[in-house]
Amino acid sequence: MLKMAGMVPVGATLVEAVGLLQRGGLDCQHGIIDWVRTFGYGDVAKYTLDYPLGLSGPALGILMNRDAWKNFTPEQKKVHVKYGAWLSAKMAIGNFIISNEEALNTVVKDKGVQLVKVGSAFDAIPENYKKVQRETNIATAKGFGVQDPAVIIDYYEQAVERWRPVSKQIGRDIDKFTEVLVREVFSKIDPDKL
């Protein structure tokens, strides 16, 4: 998608990006707004695009080593699944929404970062990319031996559409999101089968 917007993607760590931005080795950096505050990008990068370009990292509430999981008692597994729902909700709303808005307000006020509105012509870029991304993901999955990746992608896209109205009802309520995650996802998990 970045190429479609006229950008040239390069690989650099978050820390390396600071020096590259300072020396002109990078013109821009794709990531969450909180990085502008936490990594000091706001000292040199004075503009941020007011347009959602997608998630730059995993929104997972719990990651664990399989051996550690297997060594848990059934009760410990249940506790982790129970609080995994809350942690997922807290990360999604607290980190990816609220914390990023607070970071934006901070860097605008303290660092002089300007929020740049994009024209409606930019809307076509993510839409066109969805088609390219689908084909790329299908080819990549087939390369890993997935038999029919289009079915998985279709199911995922249907799930996203099913969750859109639910998300609007939840708003920014972490407890409400936790309840929905428990009902729709976590209550269907059998910890002993993980």
Question: Where are the language model's segments positioned?
Answer:
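N-terminal secretory/targeting leader peptides
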Residues: 1-194
